[in-house]
């Protein structure tokens, strides 16, 4: 009998799942097919998912800062994509 692997509960996987669920909720709400009660429930769930995603992104940003300079994480400067060279 094959073993089932446990679901991935890493922060990245949870973020991806939350974002996917949030996108699906928005899509369902935009169709206008939900009742008022369903729309309110979807909105409440969407807010919770948004907060989870926002918190995960903040934690990822802090982690990158700590990895960049663990002694002075607040001295990091915001990433500027225009400084990255795309030519090789």
UniProtKB/Swiss-Prot annotation:
Note the Pfam families from the entry.
Answer: Exonuc_VII_S
- Covalent S-S links between cysteines: none
Q: What is its main location?
A: cytoplasm
Q: What are the record keywords, sorted? A: Cytoplasm, Exonuclease, Hydrolase, Nuclease
Task: Describe the reaction catalysed, as an equation.
Answer: Exonucleolytic cleavage in either 5'- to 3'- or 3'- to 5'-direction to yield nucleoside 5'-phosphates
**Which residues lie within the region annotated Disordered?**
68-88
- Keyword Hydrolase attached: yes
**So where does this one cross the membrane?**
none
Q: What does this protein do?
A: Bidirectionally degrades single-stranded DNA into large acid-insoluble oligonucleotides, which are then degraded further into small acid-soluble oligonucleotides.
Q: Which NCBIfam families match?
A: PRK00977.1-4 (NF002140), xseB (TIGR01280)
Instruction: State the HAMAP family in the record.
Output: Exonuc_7_S
The subunit structure is:
Heterooligomer composed of large and small subunits.
Q: What is this protein called?
A: Exodeoxyribonuclease 7 small subunit
User: Organism, per UniProt?
Assistant: Xylella fastidiosa (strain 9a5c)
Q: What is the lineage of its organism?
A: Bacteria, Pseudomonadati, Pseudomonadota, Gammaproteobacteria, Lysobacterales
